Amino acid sequence: MSVSPVSIVSTPVAVSESPAGSPVQPAVPVTVRWRGSEAYQTSFDAMRAFTDTRTADTGDEIWVVEHPPVYTLGQAGDPAHLLVADSGVPLVKVDRGGQITYHGPGQIVVYLLLDLRRRKLMVRTLVTKIEEAVIETLAAYNLASVRKAGAPGIYVASGVHEGAKIAALGLKIRNGCSYHGLSLNVKMDLRPFLAINPCGYAGLETVDMASLEVAADWNDVAHTLVGRLIANLDGESAAADKPQALEHSND
C-alpha cells in the first residue's frame, strides 16, 4: 500500500504581552510532511531544490521519511571510514556536515527545512533544540540518553550499552536556511553499521531502541519526536492530529 504525503501545521500563537511588558514572539508555523519510504537521493534532491528556491515568504517544513539501505558521507567526510567497499549498500556523497552514517528501514529520518533568520536561531541553538527533542523522545520510552561534547548526536546514558550511539545529526545551512537533519534508530538491522566507522569514530557501538529492550512502534516514536521538535522550536507545547500511518518495514 502506498501512502500519500500528509501535511499538518502547528498553529502560531498570537503576539501577547509578557508580565514585563515586552512582546512575546509568535510561534512560526511549520508544515510536517510524512513522505513514507523514499530513496535517499530523492529526498536529497528535493530538500536542496526546496532550499534553493525558497523565499522570505516560504514556510518552514519538517519532513519525516524512512530510507532503503544507504550510506551517506558528509562534505568533509573521509571515504576511509567506509570499511567494506563491496557491502552492497550504495554510498551517496552529500553536503551536510559530519562523516559517514547509515540509513535503513526501521530508522526515523527527519529533515528540518527552517529559515533560521526568521526564527532568530543560531546554528548551535538549533542543534541543542534538536538534541533535546531526541532526549525527550527517548525519555518518553524510559530510555536515558545524553549528548557528548564535540560529537553531535545522542548516546545511551547508562547500562550495558552506555556510550552507544542511538541518534545521528547533521545539518547544512545555506543562505540562513537549514536542511538535512537527524536520524533515530527504532528497530533496524544494525549490521551495516559494522562496515563503517559511524560518524568517523572507529569502534563506536550503534544501537536502536529494540537493542535497549523497548518494543516501540515506528509511527508512535515518529509522532512523539516530531511533537517534541515542534515544541522545542516554538518554545511551547505543540500538538497535532496524527496523519495516517506510514508504510514501512523493520525487516
Curated annotation (Swiss-Prot):
Pathway: Protein modification; protein lipoylation via endogenous pathway; protein N(6)-(lipoyl)lysine from octanoyl-[acyl-carrier-protein]: step 1/2. The record marks 165 as: Lowers pKa of active site Cys. GO terms for molecular function: lipoyl(octanoyl) transferase activity. Residues 56-237 form the BPL/LPL catalytic domain. It comes from the Bacteria. It catalyses: octanoyl-[ACP] + L-lysyl-[protein] = N(6)-octanoyl-L-lysyl-[protein] + holo-[ACP] + H(+). Pfam families: LplA-B_cat. Substrate binds at residues 96-103, 168-170, 181-183. The active site is at 199 (acyl-thioester intermediate). Catalyzes the transfer of endogenously produced octanoic acid from octanoyl-acyl-carrier-protein onto the lipoyl domains of lipoate-dependent enzymes. Lipoyl-ACP can also act as a substrate although octanoyl-ACP is likely to be the physiological substrate. PANTHER family: LIPOYLTRANSFERASE 2, MITOCHONDRIAL-RELATED, OCTANOYLTRANSFERASE. HAMAP family: LipB. Belongs to the LipB family. This is Octanoyltransferase.
